[in-house]
């Protein structure tokens, strides 16, 4: 939960003394060295020493002072450069945690800047307690929200200066950093939003017209003129003199305190109140289902009801079709009403999205929904690239951009999915799905994506799980959540800065299943005859996903090559992000001084992004969201959160891993080990050498905190011989119907096959349904064990 902590202040003095360089970056001369310092938790400025020319042993003896906060993680970045006419050479980067310093004591640190040549940099530190009064910060133990204010800057005098025409006024460290100086006298003030405890830098810069997210990202273009702004108190009124060429301009400043409005980003690791209310209602439904399933004399009391989660995997159309089949089987044996959660990755989210358009879908016969989807899945997929559709995509994305959202290639993929799943435009949103859970009538849906952290040199990539429910979107790793209808809005320091229309569900589908990196590019080329403009940009960010190495089988569909509309759409994506960029609702928040002690973080690994707090997600202006299959191609992670207290996971895998059917489960187990999450101990080596089964049951009796896991891999084991549980196949037609190929290179269900024939669609639905119904007794036995374990956790004096 969000708490208040008293933050005291310290004064940090950093003196860059000297360096010893035994080798030069320059071929013909000695190095011309200088040092930069950056402490982003104290200042938005980057400080720099003078340049010492032609010296192997440069001396600076320059001191820089910072006002630092006691309760945030303060990492000083020190960079040693060699000045060069073309581009300066970075010699070394040092990251120093100032919590290693002893307050009140001067300390000289000797840093090795080149391990092979033993080059060194000497720096003197002094950390002194400030006499400033302490201040309250809001925190959840991981993130820290500093005091927030609006800053109005009067531009009357700027408007009369011709030198600033078409320029932007830039306030480093503020939100938004860049605001174009208007060419009209009507605008009297420009408003920025600031962290009152942060030193900022005000200046004038040329516009950066090529940046899609220009209003929140820091431009690489240097300031033409600048002046530092010390931290400003609430209610501050004053002026600052800004140099403009040989002239100066006085700007009036005024801050407005906004703290009384409270945070609009929920900083908490618990589930939201609305989900808790749902759980109370769902327990009644589940209790009644368990009474019927297990033949109980009465429904178990609310405290005894086990929490059962259905977990779907990725796998494109195969996963979507497969999940329909599995849900059909679960409905037939009465288990669907006993489930509390349902999660999905990639293709399985298509099934969920389709079903949750109906408020009571799990109470209705799923055969009707399956039949309706059959009509969509058996149409020619290349119809998604007709001229009319391309024009529609262009118009819709242009509308999204005008609303204020960042537009990316993933948006087009989402619109393709809209055509594929719904066959028409849908205006539904994620928050609309609240009506499907308000009475506890359906399992609670959790959609998934991951936020990619992969731009840190020398570090492994990190995929941070992001979950989407009808009530909230958030990243549990940081304990930060926003209302579903506000996802994509602009936030700073936990406060909403700009409200935007809620994103339509197709755009979210594009994020949840962005394996398009291969498939949509291939289909685009086939449909239009043109190489799409985004092809050169497809790198590991979006291509490291489950795809088939063999070429997919596509419908034959003839279109005129390189139509004008196709060119218009492909041109639309020039200079736009390839993966989904969304405004970061954690923007401006700092990390708590001991964040690295939390099991959500792997900061102990020096090659993990978690070890670099200045580069973690709160420091980013946007989230970089992709298909969760980039991390683990099955959605167990959201229901493994201890706050959800899941007792039984029914894991439904449609991942294409015929030679490694436990791949997604192995990755899940590794994730749990890294994050200290209870999970059954599984001997995968033994299982890999045993005959394959339709269902695996994993229960760790030594660890009652670990959920029971039922695992259904993508297999055809006994369905080849039985058309229904206990009913053998008879005759050539029935035997042929059982030959559903889900493992060879000739299978019609390979990931890149986006549509199926009617027969193939029905066959996969029936196979997945059979695998569930054929194992009814094992499923019921596991549910009974989950009920027993739940009851054993309840103290005897509690009344059920």
Where is each model-derived feature located?
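Short strand-edge motifs at loop-to-beta-strand transitions and within beta-strands
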Residues: 60-64, 188-190
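Generic structural detector for well-ordered beta-strands
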Residues: 50, 65-67, 95-97
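Calcium-regulated, polybasic anionic-phospholipid
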Residues: 10-56, 84, 151-182
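Long amphipathic alpha-helical scaffold regions
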Residues: 16, 68-72, 80, 88, ...
């Amino acid at each position: 939960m969000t708490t208040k902590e008293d933050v005291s202040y310290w004064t940090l003095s950093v003196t860059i003394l000297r360096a010893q360089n035994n080798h030069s970056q320059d071929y013909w001369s000695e190095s011309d060295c200088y040092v930069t310092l950056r402490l982003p938790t104290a200042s938005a400025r980057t400080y720099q020493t003078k340049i010492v020319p032609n010296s192997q042993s440069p001396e600076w003896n320059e001191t820089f002072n910072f006002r630092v906060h006691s309760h945030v993680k303060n990492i000083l970045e020190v960079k040693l450069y060699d000045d060069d006419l073309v581009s300066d050479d970075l010699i070394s980067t040092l990251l120093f945690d100032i919590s290693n310093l002893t307050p009140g004591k001067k300390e000289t640190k000797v840093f090795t800047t080149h391990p092979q040549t033993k080059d060194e940099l000497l720096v003197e530190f002094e950390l002194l307690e400030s006499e400033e009064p302490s201040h309250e910060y809001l925190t959840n133990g991981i993130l820290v929200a500093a005091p927030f204010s609006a800053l109005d800057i009067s531009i009357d005098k700027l408007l009369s200066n011709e030198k600033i025409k078409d320029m932007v006024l830039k306030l480093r460290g503020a939100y938004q950093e860049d605001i174009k100086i208007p060419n009209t006298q009507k605008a009297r003030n420009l408003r920025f939003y600031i962290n009152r405890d942060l030193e900022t830098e005000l200046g004038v810069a040329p516009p950066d017209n090529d940046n899609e997210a220009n209003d929140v990202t820091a431009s690489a273009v240097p300031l033409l003129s600048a002046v530092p702004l010390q931290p400003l108190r609430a209610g501050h009124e004053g002026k600052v003199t800004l140099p403009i060429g040989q002239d100066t301009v006085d700007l009036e400043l005024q801050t407005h305190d906004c703290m009384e409005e409270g945070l609009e980003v929920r900083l908490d690791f618990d589930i939201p109140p609305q989900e808790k209310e749902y759980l109370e209602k769902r327990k009644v439904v589940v209790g009644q289902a368990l009474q019927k399933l297990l033949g109980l004399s009465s429904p178990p009391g609310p405290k005894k009801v086990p929490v059962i989660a259905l977990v779907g995997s990725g796998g494109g159309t195969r996963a979507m079709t497969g999940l329909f089949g599995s849900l059909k089987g679960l409905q037939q044996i009465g288990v669907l009403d006993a489930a509390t959660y349902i999660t999905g990755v990639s293709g399985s989210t298509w099934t969920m999205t389709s079903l949750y358009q109906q408020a009571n879908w799990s109470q209705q016969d799923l055969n009707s929904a399956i039949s309706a989807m059959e009509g969509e899945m058996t149409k020619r997929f290349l119809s998604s690239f007709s001229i009319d559709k391309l024009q529609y995509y262009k118009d819709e994305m242009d509308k999204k951009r005008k609303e204020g959202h960042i537009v990316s290639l993933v948006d087009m993929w989402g619109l393709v999915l809209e055509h594929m799943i719904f066959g028409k435009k849908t205006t539904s949103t994620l928050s609309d799905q609240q009506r499907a859970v308000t009475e506890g009538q359906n399992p609670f849906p959790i959609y998934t994506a991951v936020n990619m952290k992969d731009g840190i040199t020398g570090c492994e990539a990190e995929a941070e799980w992001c979950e989407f429910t009808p009530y909230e979107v958030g990243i549990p790793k940081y304990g930060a959540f926003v209302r579903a209808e506000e996802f994509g809005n602009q936030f700073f320091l936990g406060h909403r800065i700009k409200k935007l229309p809620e994103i339509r569900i197709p755009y979210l589908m594009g994020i949840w299943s962005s394996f398009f990196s291969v498939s949509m590019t291939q289909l685009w080329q086939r449909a239009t005859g043109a190489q799409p403009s985004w092809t050169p940009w497809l790198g590991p960010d979006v291509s490291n996903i489950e795809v088939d190495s063999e070429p997919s089988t596509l419908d034959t569909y003839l279109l005129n090559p390189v139509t004008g509309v196709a060119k218009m759409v492909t041109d639309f994506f020039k200079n736009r992000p390839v993966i989904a960029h969304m405004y970061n609702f954690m923007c401006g928040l700092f990390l708590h001084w001991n964040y690295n002690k939390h099991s959500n973080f792997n900061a102990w690994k020096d090659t993990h992004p978690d070890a670099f707090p200045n580069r973690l997600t709160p420091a980013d202006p946007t989230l970089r969201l992709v298909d969760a299959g980039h991390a683990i191609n099955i959605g167990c992670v959201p229901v493994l959160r201890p706050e959800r207290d899941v007792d039984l996971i029914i894991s439904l895998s449609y991942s294409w891993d015929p030679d490694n059917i436990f791949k997604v489960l192995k990755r899940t187990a590794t994730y749990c080990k890294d994050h200290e999450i209870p999970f059954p101990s599984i001997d995968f080596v033994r299982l890999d050498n045993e005959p394959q089964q339709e269902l695996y049951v994993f229960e760790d009796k030594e660890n009652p905190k670990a959920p029971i896991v039922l695992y259904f891999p993508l297999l055809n084991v006994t369905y080849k011989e039985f058309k229904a549980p206990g009913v053998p196949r008879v005759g050539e037609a029935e035997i042929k119907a059982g030959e559903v190929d889900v493992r060879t290179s000739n299978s019609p269900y390979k990931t890149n096959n986006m549509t199926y024939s009617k027969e193939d669609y029905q066959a996969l639905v029936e196979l997945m349904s059979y695998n569930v119904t054929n194992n009814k007794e094992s499923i019921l036995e596991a549910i009974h064990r989950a009920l027993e374990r739940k009851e054993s956790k309840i103290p005897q004096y509690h009344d059920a």
